[in-house]
Amino acid sequence: MSDINATRLPIWGIGCNPCVGDDVTSVLTRGEA
C-alpha cells in the first residue's frame, strides 16, 4: 500500500499542470500495462 500512496502523491502534485499530468498519465499507463 505504501507504494501506491507514494505513487499517488506525485501524481496529485503534478496533476496541477494539465500538460504535465497528461504526460505522467501516459507514462504510468504504459509502465503499468
Swiss-Prot record:
Keyword terms of this UniProt record: Hydroxylation, Thioether bond, Toxin
Tissue-specificity statement: Expressed in basidiocarps.
Post-translational modification: Processed by the macrocyclase-peptidase enzyme POPB to yield a toxic cyclic octapeptide. POPB first removes 10 residues from the N-terminus. Conformational trapping of the remaining peptide forces the enzyme to release this intermediate rather than proceed to macrocyclization. The enzyme rebinds the remaining peptide in a different conformation and catalyzes macrocyclization of the N-terminal 8 residues.
Propeptide position ranges: 1-10, 19-33
Modification type (3R,4R)-4,5-dihydroxyisoleucine: residues: 11
Highest taxon of the lineage: Eukaryota
Residues found modified as 4-hydroxyproline: 18
Pfam families: Amanitin
Disulfide partners: none
Residues annotated with (3R,4S)-4-hydroxyisoleucine modification: 11
Family: Belongs to the MSDIN fungal toxin family.
NCBIfam families in alphabetical order: amanitin (TIGR04309)
Additional facts recorded: The typical symptoms of amatoxin poisoning are gastro-intestinal distress beginning 6-12 hours after ingestion, a remission phase lasting 12-24 hours, and progressive loss of liver function culminating in death within 3-5 days. One of the few effective treatments is liver transplantation.
Listed name of the protein: Alpha-amanitin proprotein 2
Organism: Amanita exitialis
